[in-house]
Amino acid sequence: MRILADQAIPYVYKLFGSDNYVQVCDGRSISANMLKDVDVLIIRSITKVNHMLLYDSSIKFIGTVTSGVDHIDQNYLKNNNIRCVSTPGSNAVSVVEYVCATLFWLAQRDCFFLRDKTVGIIGVGNIGNLLYQRLNSLGVHTLLYDPYKSKCDTDRMSWKSLDILVSKSDILTLHVPLTYTGAYPTWHMINKDILDALPSNSILINTSRGAVVNNDDLLAILRCGKKINVILDVWESEPKLSLPLLSYVDIGTAHIAGYSFESRIRSIKKIYDDYCDYFNVKNKVNWISLGLSDIRYIAVSRLDECIINRLIQLVYNVYYDHIALKNNVLRLRGFDKLREYYCFRREWSSLLVDSKNGYNNDILFKFGFSTL
C-alpha cells in the first residue's frame, strides 16, 4: 500500500513503514498529480482536501491529525466512498495547558490571581470542557457558552447567553470549530460588537481557528486604544498574518497550542489505529514504544498560584514561542517552519509533583500534573 504523509507529522515511518511504501512531503505542496497511485493520505489542517485534489486519485483513506475538519470536503469523500478520520480530543490537554500557561504568565506579569477572575469559555467540546474542569480544580469562576451543548446539558448553572458571558467575563477564551452556516456560525463571531462589549483590561484568547475572530476589527479596536490583553495562537489567512496585529498582542504564537509531544503522538496513533481497523491490519504499536514513559520528579513544600506557575514553567514557557514567532515571521516560510520543526514540548503530566500533602496533591492531579 502506498502512503503519502505531511512531513511534519511524527512517527509516520515507525507506524506505517514496515508493511507499506511511505513518502512524506510539505503539506502545502500536496497536489493532485502526487496522489494518482496513493492509497492513504495523512495530513494536517494546512492541506485542503476537495474534488480538485482527489478527482484523479486512488485514495481510499484520509487521516487528518486535527480536531476540526473544515479543511476537508466531507460530502465529496462520502460520495466517493473515501474513509476520513480525524482526531477530536487528541490535542485537548495540550491546548488547555497552553491556555493556562498564558493565563499564569499574564498573572505573573500583571500581578493578579486567577481565583479573582471570571473566565468565559466559548465552546464546551473536548477542549472547552477540559479547561472548565481544570479551572474548577483551582476554584476559578467560569461561565460557559455553547448553544448546542446547553440544550442537552441543562444541569450546569454556568451556561450563559453570549452577550451576558462577554459582559461578565474578565477572560474570554474560544474553543469552537470554524463554521460558516447553520444556526450559530462561528466565522467572525468575535467582531466589533463583541469586542466593544468586552470589559476594559479583559483578556481575549483564541486557540481555535483564526477566522473566528475578525482580525481587522480586533486590530482597529486595539489601535483606538481599548485596553484588551490579547493571546492569539491562530490567525486569519495563515501562514500570512497581520504584522500590525502581531505588534499589539501580548502573546502571539504560530498555531502550536495543540503541539505538545503527547498530543502529536495521540493524534498519529489514533490515525494508525483507525487505519488498522479499516484495512484489517494487525496493530503492532504501543504507547511505551513511542517514548511516552519519561517523567521528572519535584517536591514542593506549599501550594499556591505562584508555585503552580513555577511548575508550569518547568515544563513549558509560552513566552519563548511568542519570541520565536516575532523573530521568524518575516523569514521565508517562517510561520510554517515554526510549526514543522516545533520544539520538544511535554505536557504537565510529565512532571511528578509531591507536595507532601494529600489535599494539595489532589489539586495538582486534577490540574494535570502527575502526583504520588
Curated annotation (Swiss-Prot):
EC number(s) reported in the record: 1.1.1.290
Species this protein is from: Blochmanniella floridana
Active site: 209, 238, 255
Chain positions recorded as NAD(+) binding sites: 146, 233, 258
Descriptive protein name: Erythronate-4-phosphate dehydrogenase
Main location: cytoplasm
GO terms classed as biological process: pyridoxine biosynthetic process
Compartments where found: Cytoplasm
Recorded GO CC terms: cytosol
Pfam families: 2-Hacid_dh (PF00389), 2-Hacid_dh_C (PF02826), DUF3410 (PF11890)
